[in-house]
Structures are given as C-alpha cells and as structure tokens.
Amino acid sequence: AGITEVALKNHYADKTNWRKMLTNNVEQIDLVAERLKVENLIPTEVQEYFYSQKNDLYEMHYPVLHYPSKVNSLSLDKTPQFQGKLTGIKGQYLLFEDGTVFNIRGSEGYIVNINV
C-alpha cells in the first residue's frame, strides 16, 4: 500500500456501499471540510503532492432517469441473457427499469452483445 493510503485507512473506509449508491441513498458530505481533514492527515513526506487548491470542487452528474428502490445484481454466469429498459448509468453500473443493475467492470473478460 502507498504511504498516503496507509495513513488514511484508519480514517476512511476503502469500500463504497454500491447498493446505497445505486438507489441514490447517499450521504451528503462537505467536501471542503473533508479536504481540510485529509490535508492534516497526509504524512509530511507526501504533502508536496497534495493538491491544496481551496475552491476547486467538481460535481459529477450521471444520466439516471430513475433510481431503483431495490437493486438486483445481474450475473452473466447465472443469467447469460437479459432484456430490459436502460434507465441510467452510474459509474461502472448500468441501471435498468426493473431494478436490475449490471456491473461492467465485474464482467471483464466476457463478450457481450447489446442491442438498442
């Protein structure tokens, strides 16, 4: 693990709750306050690499028409064929109208045909 990762692992979880993310049940965070907190946790030997611009915030907007209330993960091993209406994309996930979500990265190595 890197120097920064080791320093931050006791303060931040390294896992995103993907089910909460895909139902849009996410906690709002004050990113400016978090940046200040992280800046104080970064070890001295890597502080020169810390981007410390105070006001640069970027907001990501994902094209999602409808978030499901409950998600059902699509496994190509269990369900080799699937048909559904795409209602959104969030990160590496495709979201479908019936609550099915497809993790693109989790299906690396598969050959997938998509018909639109």
Role assignments for model-derived ranges:
Residues G2-V116:
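Conserved RNA-binding domains used in RNP assembly and mRNA/RNA metabolism
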